[in-house]
A protein has these predicted regions:
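Active-site neighborhoods of enzymes that stabilize oxyanions during catalysis
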Residues: 306-490
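His/Asp/Glu-rich, glycine-adjacent segments
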Residues: 116-120, 133-249, 363, 368-415, ...
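Calcium-binding acidic motifs and repeat modules
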Residues: 7-98, 438
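Active-site metal-binding loops of divalent metal-dependent hydrolases
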Residues: 106, 271-274, 442
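Active-site-proximal N-terminal segment of extracellular/periplasmic enzymes that hydrolyze or transfer
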Residues: 81-129
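Acidic, His- and aromatic-enriched active-site or binding-groove loops in soluble protein domains
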Residues: 89, 152-159, 245-255, 285-302
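Short secondary-structure boundary/capping segments
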Residues: 93-94, 115-120, 239-244, 280-290, ...
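Metal-dependent active-site segment of extracytoplasmic phospho-/sulfohydrolases and closely related
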Residues: 101, 253-285
Length: 499
């Protein structure tokens, strides 16, 4: 009897602890620094002074100033224990300083630029555009950003072509098995929470920020790389106004880190891709394929088998089947109302199919020069771009141009960096390459039926459209480039991290 009573008491205590922990877990981060007021010091209608309270007594003891009117804080005045004025302009060369790279997963350029224009994130220069990889999915994008080895698939759940089965899933982010980019990250949200982000997105987001803050504070690494995954989750399920409101908490978090270092830190903050901010619905791919003589299966069992891993609710999908089906499948999938275009590799050419026509991309040498040629129509809407490149003598006699020229010509296009991105997307990034890759129109997604039942998707990414392909980057020092390919952002950072 006594044992039963003790067991019951322990069970009650454990239940109370679980409930208590859950109630207080995932609450907003208790920031130490509060903004007291924002001031237009010179009366030109633009905020240039931020007065902060770090002692939680309601009195300002830190002042951030933008003295040259460029929008970025360049002077820091600290009033405790003594008054000290610190030059944080970043214009003069400094001795080696600690470096911090923060990836805010899935934050669109337009959103970060809007927040900066409202007076947030002013420790940084105005955000610039960072063009992602194709597909604009995190595993692929982070592989390119962090310059690591190939991941097995386009998402955590992928098709293993050697074993002819679906592999990975949520366990791959927990175990880090065959996910090279995870080994480079000094902080990443534990994999177990990534699926829960659809259920309790705001709690997961708060917990992610708090966990990163704690881990970074405890680290002594001279160069620290972090990935805040939950920003993407909340962008998927909240409307834009709600999302922007939550992003203000990141502003406070980064300001706190900046002040703790008295501005003497090299910060680069960026996103791996953008987001559409368009409510979208899942396509019935299984039914569509069945109507046209194919069968969706978890393995390639016959000439009619098609495998498409269904995981995140995203705007792009890899398609696997018997090689002889590839051209037929590409044309079929391109005819679906939700498809923007489909691509596949045929010999040395990348074939592009869409309702707007077809085209090919060819590479010269090792891929340093590329050619886009419309076969019929203009599937990527590049006719005017090609004409301009021809007039500017950027194309050689055979129609090839350097990857740098293609980037400069197409980075602001609706299909951002289209020629480079498609070439790399079809030939690189993953070890289990798809037979066909489909880019969906905004407003559609494909993925887990369970996740689709669970949430209303107010935004997604994955396709080649500008909103999904355009992330942002910003530094707490002067910036030269207004737009940059993601692969170029962290080259110097990692050279210094290694050395």
């Amino acid at each position: 009897m006594r044992f039963k009573f003790l067991s019951a008491a322990l069970l009650v205590l454990f239940s109370v602890w679980v409930i208590y922990s859950f109630m207080f877990w995932g609450r907003p981060v208790p920031f130490q620094i509060q903004t007291v007021e924002r001031i237009d010091g010179n009366g030109d209608g633009v905020i240039d002074t931020w007065r902060l309270d770090s002692s939680q007594d309601g009195q300002a003891d830190i002042t951030e100033l933008d003295t040259d009117g460029d929008g970025r804080i360049d002077r820091l005045q600290v009033s405790h224990p003594n008054v000290e004025v610190i030059d944080v302009s970043g214009r003069e060369p400094r001795l080696a300083r600690r470096k911090l790279a923060v990836c805010l997963d899935g934050v669109p350029y337009e959103d970060m630029a809007a927040l900066w224009d409202q007076g947030y994130f002013r420790e940084f220069a105005r955000p610039a555009k960072l063009i992602s990889s194709f597909p604009s999915l995190s595993d692929v994008a982070l592989t390119e950003l962090l310059h690591t080895g190939k991941v097995p698939g386009y998402e955590n759940l992928y098709f293993d072509t050697q074993s002819n089965q679906i592999a990975g899933g949520a366990t791959s982010t927990v175990s880090k098995v065959r996910m090279p980019y995870l080994d480079v990250l000094d902080y990443d949200e534990p994999g177990i929470f990534k699926g829960l982000a659809y259920l309790i997105p705001i709690r997961i987001y708060h917990a992610d920020l708090g966990r990163f803050r704690k881990r970074y504070a405890a680290s002594r690494l001279p160069a620290y790389v972090s990935h805040i995954c939950s920003t993407d989750s909340v962008c998927h399920v909240l409307n834009r106004e709600q999302f922007l409101k939550l992003m203000v908490e990141v502003d406070r978090l980064l300001r706190e880190i900046y002040i703790q270092h008295r501005g003497q830190i090299d910060l680069v903050v960026f996103s791996d891709h953008g987001n559409s901010h368009v409510q979208n619905r899942r396509i019935d791919l299984d039914g569509f394929l069945a109507q046209n003589g194919f069968r969706m299966e978890p393995a390639i069992r016959s000439e009619n088998s098609v495998v498409v891993p269904a995981f995140g609710l995203v705007g792009a999908l890899p398609v696997y089947s018997q090689p002889q089906n590839t051209p037929k499948l590409a044309r079929l999938l391109a005819s679906h109302e939700a498809t923007d275009f489909a691509v596949y590799l045929e010999g040395q050419q990348i074939q592009i199919c869409s309702s707007r026509g077809s085209a090919v991309i060819e590479a010269k040498g090792s891929g340093g020069s590329l050619k886009y040629a419309a076969v019929d129509g203009d599937p990527l809407q590049l006719k005017s771009v090609l004409q301009r490149m021809l007039e500017q003598k950027q194309l050689d006699a055979d129609g090839f141009a350097s990857t740098e020229s293609w980037f400069a010509a197409t980075a602001p296009h609706e299909y951002a960096d289209a020629v480079n991105a498609i070439y790399q997307g079809v030939t690189n990034h993953v070890t289990n390459r798809a037979n066909v890759f489909v880019s969906l129109k905004d407003g559609y997604h494909y993925g887990s039926p369970f996740f689709d039942w669970l949430v209303t998707m107010r935004s997604t990414h994955g396709n080649l459209r500008r909103t999904s392909m355009t992330g942002f980057f910003m530094r707490n020092s002067p910036m030269q480039a207004a737009v940059l390919p993601a692969r170029e952002l962290l080259r110097d950072f990692f050279e210094e991290k290694v050395h």
